[in-house]
Regions:
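Beta1/beta-strand and adjacent pyrophosphate-binding region of the FAD-binding site
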Residues: 1-12, 166-176
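Short hydrophobic core segments
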Residues: 7-9, 113, 128-138, 173, ...
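Glycine-rich dinucleotide-binding loop and its adjacent helix/turn
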Residues: 46, 137-192, 196, 224-225, ...
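Hydrophobic "anchor" residues
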Residues: 48, 121, 272, 299, ...
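A Rossmann-like FAD-binding core segment of flavoenzymes
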Residues: 107-110, 114-122, 190-295, 365
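FAD-site-proximal beta/loop scaffold in flavoenzymes
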Residues: 150-167, 258-331
Length: 453
């Protein structure tokens, strides 16, 4: 029997950060990982995707080089090198986390964890006990019940990130964050991309006006969108040249259509990873979207917590990180002032989009009075200098005192601009206080400052 102060199941951005923070504050920690250190985010999610986003940005820059006086020819995309660079970035960061897990006080265990009781976890034949346990097992792709969903070539983001050949034609089912990022990446790399989405607009958590403008910007680069369309089936057949292809049948307003592709990416959502944990043995309640937790991320079992995607509250890597830090502080008997109601997020398309707080849709649905202030990149000096004038910021404030309710944007470096708003919202700042902050000239952040005046 191995006893420690804290057991953490999962070494993603929630688990490994919590482990390091706990150990540096004097707790003995056992962290259990079934796959690779760093979890889905590092190995099969955020980091490899953002690496490919950067590759795609470079390709787009070369395509526009003549406008900057540089006569450059793009030539063929060396997809093997693209993927090699992605693997190198992931490997380097994984090595860093593995080193971090050697911090005194941390015991890193490879294997699959399974509850024996509320405070005992088995990994193979070894038993580990602790007063406090954090479940941080993340999420996995959710496959919808579509005919032909198991046909070879129908993949999730995990398999797409492991491709060895650039697909000539890529069909993406779902226009959420994952679908939109891959649409942007693969269209830049040269694939013919088709996106099929059931909803009226892409990116449902983003302000619908911003989402529409972003979709239109990506459409101009050749991505074909079919919105309000439901996929009916996927089948495999031989093309006219004898090659194998996938045919996706979808329906829009009662009219059936088909699109052919070499690869079909299913990006219709994710679900909590709880299989094999044997939660029943610990009496832990699990709901439709994940493990049920309170506002301190504690389950119905005292001393057992669930953070990140596995609790289904907010499927963002940084949400997992800060939930983990909050839990460790609670275990240590310390307070914090983390505002989980202020959660910035970003979509790394080209151009990128980002948000924090309420959207105009949220405010209208809730019947909240607000003032919307809009700013456009096209009138900003830095945006013109960068040839990045396609962008917009929407800032929502209360009419009576100008308190900031939210900000949604798309355009170059919008994720950085949104972080400024997140900092202000954490302090309940008003738009007049934003107006008093000196902004460097020339910067894209001046778009935000201009609409505060």
């Amino acid at each position: 029997m191995n006893n420690s102060d804290l057991i953490i199941i999962g070494s993603g951005p929630g688990g490994y950060r919590a482990a390091h923070f706990a150990a540096t504050n004097g707790l003995s920690v056992v962290i259990i990982e079934a796959k690779e250190a760093g979890g889905t985010c590092l190995n099969r999610g955020c980091i490899p995707t953002k690496t490919l986003c950067r590759n795609a940005e470079v390709v787009e820059t070369v395509r526009k080089a003549a406008a900057f006086g540089a006569e450059a020819s793009l030539g063929a995309i060396d997809f093997a090198k693209v993927m090699e660079r992605k693997d190198q970035v992931v490997s380097q960061l994984r090595s860093g986390i593995e080193l971090l897990m050697q911090t005194p006080g941390i015991t890193f265990v490879k294997g699959t964890a399974s509850f024996k009781d509320a405070h005992t976890v088995a990994v193979g034949d070894e038993l580990y006990t602790a007063k406090n346990i954090i479940i941080a097992t993340g999420s996995e792709a959710k496959m919808p019940p579509i005919e032909g969903i198991n046909v070879p070539g129908v993949v999730t983001s995990t398999e797409l990130l492991a491709l060895t050949k650039l697909p000539r034609r890529l069909c993406i089912i779902g226009a959420g964050v994952i679908g939109m990022e891959f649409a942007s990446i693969f269209s830049s790399l040269g694939s013919e991309v088709k996106v099929i989405e059931f909803l009226k607009e892409c990116l449902p958590t983003l302000d619908s006006d911003i989402a529409k403008r972003l979709r239109q910007a990506i459409s101009k680069r050749g991505v074909d969108f079919s919105m309000q369309s439901g996929v009916k089936s996927i089948r495999e057949e031989n093309a006219e040249d004898g090659s194998r292809q996938l045919v996706v049948t979808f329906e829009k307003k009662g009219k059936a259509s088909e699109v052919s592709a070499d690869i079909v990416l299913v990006a219709t959502g994710r679900r909590a990873v709880v299989e094999g944990l044997n939660l029943e043995a610990a009496g832990i309640e699990c709901g439709r979207t994940g493990i049920v937790v309170d506002d301190n991320f504690q389950t119905n079992v005292e001393g057992v917590y669930a953070i990140g995607d596995v609790n289904g509250r907010c499927m963002l890597a940084h949400a997992a990180t800060f939930q983990g830090l909050h839990v460790v502080r609670r275990i240590l008997g310390k307070e914090d002032n983390i505002r989980f109601d202020i959660m910035p997020s970003a979509i790394f398309t080209t151009p990128e989009a980002a948000s924090v707080g309420k959207s105009e849709d949220n405010l209208k649905d809730a019947g909240t009075e607000y003032v919307c202030r809009k700013g456009f990149y096209r009138s900003n000096g830095k945006a013109l200098a960068m040839d990045a004038t396609d962008g917009m910021i929407k800032l929502f404030v209360t009419p009576e005192d100008g308190r900031i309710l939210g900000c949604h944007a798309y355009g170059a470096h919008s994720s950085d601009i949104i972080q400024e708003v997140a900092a202000l919202m954490n302090k309940d700042a008003t738009v007049s206080e934003l107006a008093d902050i000196i902004h460097t000239h020339p910067t894209l952040s001046e778009v935000l400052h201009d609409i505060s005046l």
